[in-house]
Amino acid sequence: MAVKEVRFTSDARDRMLRGVDIMANAVRVTLGPKGRNVVIDKSFGAPRITKDGVSVAKEIELEDKFENMGAQMLREVASRTSDIAGDGTTTATVLAQAIVREGAKAVAAGMNPMDLKRGIDLAVEAIVRELRTNARKVSKNAEIAQVATISANGDAEIGRYLAEAMEKVGNEGVITVEEAKTAEIELEVVEGMQFDRGYLSPYFITNQEKMRVELEDAYILLHEKKLSNLQAMIPILESVIQSGKPLLIIAEDVEGEALATLVVNKLRGGLKIAAVKAPGFGDRRKSMLEDIAILTGGTVISEELGTKLESATIDILGRAKRVMVEKETTTIVDGAGSKADIGGRVAQIKAQIEDTTSDYDREKLQERLAKLAGGVAVIRVGGSTEIEVKEKKDRVDDALHATRAAVEEGILPGGGVALLRVVSVLNGLATANDDQRVGIEIVRRAIEAPVRQIAENAGAEGSIIVGKLREKEDFAFGWNAQTGEFGDLFQMGVIDPAKVVRAALQDAASVAGLLVTTEAMIAEKPKKDGQPQMPPAPGMDF
């Protein structure tokens, strides 16, 4: 067992705080419309330029083990916010740093860390309730465009295209982002479908950065039953390998020998392949497999239809221009099915919706109809160089997540102002003791941090901006960092999704509370550099 190094109390917290500061200071420069870029060196290819907080956080690894622990816990804040809301990672990091700093001071002054954490939790619960109460529902296309523009770092073109995409496929519709071969941004709505099933093995992943499988011009095998024996699949697999195209298998399940062999084939580079479970259950699964078959121009291999896997040829496989399989979803874009067949299937489902008396069945039929008829909006992002395309694609991804979050939970005034406006809810909050009251005050001071940082990144004095905002009690009154003007942020189009603000605060407080209550840290002791020199061989005098 490796030798461990242990740090206690203030020594542990100081080392950890240094790591938190290094991480947060690298991320915080990206906050707001006038935030700066961060350049990340990659082991291969050109450096990456980004303004995405979580992308910066994921790249930071510190040499000192104890500092690195602090940095990695702060990275967890950004990652969790990104997973929940898809945006707001920089805000969450700035909030977490502020809470940790204030908390460390309070602990050093002799406050009880557990009571501080309880006070922090009470304050966050109260603020989240108030944020939800004050959130305004998104109803207009213009508001969706404004949210997307803010999240895309003030790029109105990205905001316009995202709003247009949502208008075409609906707020719940599927929108994918790809790299374009031109220098412009393009929007196209293609026949496509998404269902809630992910890859059966992470070894199928082809894009490690996005953690997903991407198959271009793929064949699709649709099977009604479980696949556990590989023998029956060999003829069809050989045909696909000869064609040189990738293959997506959709079946009730793929397990045992069949899954293991597919993974081995993928790893050895012989076959670009992925396997997913078929969506739905029972009769609904059969119907959804048939929907996919019609969309892709394939045939479902089913005993009821008299088709067997052993005798199947490549002609019964479906085709799609692009397939993306993530951990929990599969998206099929531009299937090879004929428009007439798809139209006939849509008409059939509409007739079933009219005939059914069950609300549950009607809801499920409407879901199928939306998947089949809604299509997939593809936003193609272009640029002059590969670096520019990747940077712009990051911003489009952020904007897409932000707009979805806005539709889900509503919008609030942007620029960090919403948190400042709800701080009054902390005034009458009951606590069990004075240390919990200090925890509440820590949150009261920390929620100024995003406004201060946005102001500093825009070249203004954070304290002056916060002071002017406090002079007015109007909920929507704030400072537009892009123009340097004060006014109604809703009218100016400076808005944040409520879900993003909420998730940023909750995740920041959660991890910061754990850091504040840390009393000891254990890490592996670094090995000493250099090997002992060998003694000179006999007869070798130097």
From Swiss-Prot:
Quickly give the catalysed reaction. Answer: ATP + H2O + a folded polypeptide = ADP + phosphate + an unfolded polypeptide
Which keywords does this chain's UniProt record carry?
ATP-binding, Chaperone, Cytoplasm, Isomerase, Nucleotide-binding
Q: Which CDD domains does the record cross-reference, listed alphabetically?
A: GroEL (cd03344)
What are the start and end residues of every segment in region (Disordered)? 523-542
A Pfam family annotated for this chain is Cpn60_TCP1
Which GO cellular component does the record give, naming just one? cytoplasm
The answer to whether UniProt assigns keyword Isomerase to this entry is: yes
EC number(s) per UniProt?
5.6.1.7
Q: Which domain of life is it from?
A: Bacteria
Biased region (Pro residues) positions are: 533-542
Which is an annotated GO molecular function term of this record?
Answer: ATP binding
Cellular compartment(s) = Cytoplasm
Which BP terms in the Gene Ontology apply to this protein? protein refolding
Q: What residues does ATP bind to?
A: 30-33, 51, 87-91, 415, 496
Q: Which family does it belong to?
A: Belongs to the chaperonin (HSP60) family.
UniProt function note: Together with its co-chaperonin GroES, plays an essential role in assisting protein folding. The GroEL-GroES system forms a nano-cage that allows encapsulation of the non-native substrate proteins and provides a physical environment optimized to promote and accelerate protein folding.
State whether it acts alone or in a complex, and with which partners, per the record.
Answer: Forms a cylinder of 14 subunits composed of two heptameric rings stacked back-to-back. Interacts with the co-chaperonin GroES.
Q: What is the name of this protein?
A: Chaperonin GroEL 2
**From which lineage does this chain's organism come?**
Bacteria, Pseudomonadati, Pseudomonadota, Alphaproteobacteria, Hyphomicrobiales
Task: Tell me the name of the encoding gene.
Answer: groEL2
